[in-house]
């Protein structure tokens, strides 16, 4: 990326020299409907350490008109370059800087994003500043430890709404003058501007009153279930304020559902932005509502952990995200009135799976990553930073005890409110409340990479009584290219003993909790007891480790996986089977057989939908190529059978309809999709609504049944932003050279597409059953990649680098071509990481394909 980086050392030096007091930011957005640029005027007051010196402030702008430092005009041609304005001759004590610039609206989801809704032709704006993009809107010292107050003044078109971190004032002559914020970091400031629809309420408890707002575009207003969102929000307020013993720290709490958002949501202080796909236009399963609720709670937790108390530098990003990820699940599991008390099942099913995958890539890194610059942090929003970190926090809670954990957190908030911290500050507070020395624990869990494997070693006598039980811990070699050494870690785990009852259900009859440390840990608590049908290590999912079953337990689970009475042990066994498949320990054909034998009894809809995705991935990537079509046929026939057998109108019925649409292939199956679309056939209870229609259309386009005219006709039914994206996916999915060339040109050779449409085109372009058609693009990908990375914003370049990598071409040739590019292209560290991660997927797929082929012999 050209000239826009910032190193940790530069940030450290700047923080040593400067203390920032306040920003006054004046933006003229009256031309937002037309786009282009807008006037940005920033006044910053800051103090300089004794002796004075020189520094710089960050700004990304097409034009800088004025830079005035302490009343002296600086030559903009001399001081402004790339993303920095040099500040020479700083005086000890108070300095005042004024910068006048023209900043640009974006369509990449970075900085001030501008979107025009095709329904009403109105522009909608919102900011996204994490990590370094406040500098795209106003001149800022773009690092988290230079906190300040921020006072925004915004001029906007008449009839629009302007939302920021502070309560929204009454406009005067279409000018909104907000009161200053508390001291916060620049990356959690925000502006959301446009003719948004809103619903308002108040959170009230024990004399506290916090205004609540929910916003979306008017074209989504009919779908906005504000009452449900407010309900989850209030539960979060109740639970977090009790657990944290610290009142919500801002004056109001708005949640704004915004278009073309790159992430799930963003924790702007008091003004959380959330992707508007969470305003559901069509029927979704309860799993989607659970994920939305988790997102709401995640961002609310950040108001304390991240906004009130903020990391000093981005190497502690993991603590921000891990804590919020842990807190969302803990709140859903324990908050009174929660609709998702099984949230730890979802955590095991989704977050842990993400973490285990990320931790086995060549880019694996310690949870506490070494973040040397902005390029490092931009690719570090990964499964280790979020999911492994949250898993390890769950382990820490088990290790120190829940009461001690939250007492430590309470002390941490009180001690560091509106300040910046390091990991040692939190660990110190937890050591005080728990009495445990956490230095050794931290070194093993936070400062090393990789994942352990836990295996049971069991001996029984002739009567089936356990005579010896131990847990063997392994530390597999780290992936090639990863830094560090394999590490054995201390684990606090539970062991569950399960037997079949008279109804054929697997019921837990005993539970042992213990510390596992070193290579072999004896478990005397189980010696002398009758051997149960299943012994499950890491029951209750307290620790972070791969778990393997002993031979007898595996045999019982293979036959009775769906018979566990509780969802969490089922999820743990499903996860173990999937992990074994990815590790080439279980053949894809055997994994499919296991899923087909147990999925019909799986009640957790989130687990069912994960199994759908995993089976498709396994067949597409991990099956022996000669067996792939037969396995796809078997799976698709099963999806149709389950669709027809599912309870009418149920979540399971909808999930099976989507799974069927994803792989429908025979003329009869495709005829059924077509007939469900035009209404000549129906399945009782199945509403073929807008989103399901698009799933059917996209599949019919991908197999060549539908062309441009059918896609255009469907778009006429749904002339919305979502419809535009779905149509783009369908057009790119068509199995023709012309369709692929058009899609490729629009993404790689042009930079005109907005972020969400580019993502949609990439999703359609890559079809796993179009390998031959896509083969020619392997070489074109490598030829274009460096130029794309150099010329696009980070978000847009990453979409292309990851999304268009030839992952469907599972072959040694793809590995060789990737290696040749890595050796010759000299990519920077961030791009090298992304390509190396994709390469790792090819290696894993080749191993799994070999294992599947061997199982057929």
Swiss-Prot record:
GO biological process, one term: proteolysis
Protein name: Aminopeptidase N
Quaternary context: Monomer.
Functional summary from the UniProt entry: Aminopeptidase with broad substrate specificity to several peptides. Shows strong preference for leucine but also cleaves next to Arg and Lys in peptide-bond-containing substrates.
Pfam families with a match to the protein in the record: ERAP1_C (PF11838), Peptidase_M1 (PF01433), Peptidase_M1_N (PF17900)
GO molecular function: alanyl aminopeptidase activity; metalloaminopeptidase activity; peptide binding; zinc ion binding
Gene3D superfamilies given in the database record: Neutral Protease Domain 2 (1.10.390.10), tricorn interacting facor f3 domain (2.60.40.1730)
Chief location category: cytoplasm
Organism: Streptomyces lividans
One Gene Ontology CC term in the entry: cytoplasm
Binding residue positions for Zn(2+): 298, 302, 321
Site (Transition state stabilizer) residue list: 386
Binding site residues for substrate: 130, 264-268
EC number annotated for this UniProt entry: 3.4.11.2
Localization in the cell: Cytoplasm
């Amino acid at each position: 990326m050209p000239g826009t980086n910032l190193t940790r050392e530069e940030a450290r030096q700047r923080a040593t020299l400067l203390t920032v007091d306040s920003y006054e930011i004046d933006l003229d957005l009256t031309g937002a409907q037309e786009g282009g640029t807008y006037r940005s005027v920033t006044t910053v007051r800051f103090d300089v350490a004794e002796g004075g010196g020189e520094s710089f402030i960050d700004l990304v702008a097409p034009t800088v008109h004025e830079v005035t430092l302490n009343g002296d005009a600086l030559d903009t041609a001399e001081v402004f370059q790339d993303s920095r304005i040099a500040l020479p001759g700083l005086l000890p004590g108070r300095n005042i800087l004024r910068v006048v610039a023209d900043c640009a609206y974006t369509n990449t989801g970075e900085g001030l994003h501008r979107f025009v809704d095709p329904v009403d032709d109105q522009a909608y704006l919102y900011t996204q500043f994490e990590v370094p993009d406040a500098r795209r809107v106003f001149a800022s010292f773009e690092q988290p430890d230079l906190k300040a107050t921020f006072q925004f003044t915004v001029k906007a078109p008449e009839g629009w709404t302007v939302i920021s971190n502070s309560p929204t004032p009454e406009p005067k002559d279409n000018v909104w003058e907000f009161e200053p914020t508390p001291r916060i970091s620049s990356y959690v400031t925000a502006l959301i501007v446009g003719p948004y629809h809103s619903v308002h309420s108040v959170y009230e408890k024990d004399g506290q009153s916090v205004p609540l707002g929910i916003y979306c575009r008017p074209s989504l207003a009919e779908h906005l279930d504000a009452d449900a969102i407010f309900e989850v929000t209030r539960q979060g307020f109740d639970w977090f304020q009790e657990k944290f013993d610290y009142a919500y720290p801002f004056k109001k709490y708005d949640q704004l559902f915004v278009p073309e958002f790159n992430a799930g949501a963003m924790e702007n202080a008091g003004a959380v932005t959330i992707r508007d796909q969470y305003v559901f236009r069509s029927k979704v399963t309860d799993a989607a509502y659970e994920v939305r609720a988790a997102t709401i709670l995640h961002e609310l937790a950040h108001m304390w952990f991240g906004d009130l108390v903020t990391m000093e530098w981005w190497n502690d990003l993991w603590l921000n995200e891990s804590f919020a990820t842990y807190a969302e699940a803990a709140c859903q599991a324990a908050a009174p009135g929660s609709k998702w008390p099984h949230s730890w099942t979802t955590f095991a099913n989704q977050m842990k799976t993400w973490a285990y995958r990320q931790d086995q890539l060549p880019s694996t890194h310690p949870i506490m990553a070494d973040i040397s610059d902005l390029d490092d942090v931009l690719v570090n929003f990964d499964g280790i930073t979020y999911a492994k970190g949250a898993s390890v926090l769950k382990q820490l809670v088990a290790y120190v005890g829940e009461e001690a954990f939250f007492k430590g957190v309470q002390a941490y908030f009180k001690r560091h409110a509106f300040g910046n911290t390091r990991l040692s500050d939190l660990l110190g507070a937890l050591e005080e409340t728990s009495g445990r020395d956490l230095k050794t624990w931290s070194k093993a869990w936070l400062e090393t990479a990789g994942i352990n494997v836990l295996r049971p070693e069991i001996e029984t006598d002739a009567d089936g009584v356990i005579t010896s039980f131990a847990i063997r811990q392994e530390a597999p070699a780290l992936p090639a290219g990863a830094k560090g050494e394999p590490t054995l870690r201390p684990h606090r785990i539970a062991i569950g003993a399960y037997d079949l009852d008279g109804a054929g259900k697997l019921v837990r009859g005993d539970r042992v909790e213990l510390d596992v440390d070193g290579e072999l840990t004896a478990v005397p608590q189980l010696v002398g007891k009758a051997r149960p049908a299943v012994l499950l290590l890491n029951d209750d999912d307290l620790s972070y480790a791969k778990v393997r079953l002993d031979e007898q337990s595996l045999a019982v689970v293979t036959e009775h996986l769906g018979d566990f009475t509780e969802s969490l042990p089922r999820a743990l066994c499903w996860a173990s089977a999937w992990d074994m498949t990815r590790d080439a320990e279980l053949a894809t054909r055997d994994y499919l057989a296991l899923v087909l034998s147990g999925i019909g009894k799986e009640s957790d809809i989130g687990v069912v939908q994960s199994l759908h995705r995993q089976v498709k991935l396994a067949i597409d990537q991990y099956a022996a190529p000669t067996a792939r079509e037969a396995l796809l046929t078997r799976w698709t026939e099963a999806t149709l059978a389950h669709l027809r057998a599912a309870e009418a109108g149920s979540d399971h019925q909808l999930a099976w309809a989507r799974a069927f649409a994803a792989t429908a292939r025979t003329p009869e199956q495709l005829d059924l999709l077509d007939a469900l679309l035009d209404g000549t056939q129906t399945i009782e209870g199945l509403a073929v609504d807008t989103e399901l229609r698009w799933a059917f259309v996209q599949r019919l386009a991908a197999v060549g049944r539908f062309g441009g005219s059918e896609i255009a006709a469907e778009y006429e039914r749904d002339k919305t932003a979502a419809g535009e994206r779905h149509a783009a996916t369908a057009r790119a999915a068509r199995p023709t050279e012309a369709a692929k060339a058009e899609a490729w040109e629009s993404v790689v050779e042009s930079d005109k597409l907005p972020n969400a449409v580019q993502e949609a085109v990439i999703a359609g372009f890559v079809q796993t059953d179009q390998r031959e058609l896509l083969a020619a693009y392997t070489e074109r990908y490598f030829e274009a990649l460096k130029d794309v990375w150099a010329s696009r914003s980070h978000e847009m370049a990453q979409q292309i680098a990851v999304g268009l990598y030839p992952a469907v071409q599972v072959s040694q040739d793809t590995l060789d071509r990737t290696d040749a590019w890595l050796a010759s292209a000299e990519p920077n560290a961030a791009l090298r990481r992304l390509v190396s991660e994709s390469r790792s997927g090819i290696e894993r797929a080749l191993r799994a394909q070999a294992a599947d082929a061997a199982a057929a012999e």
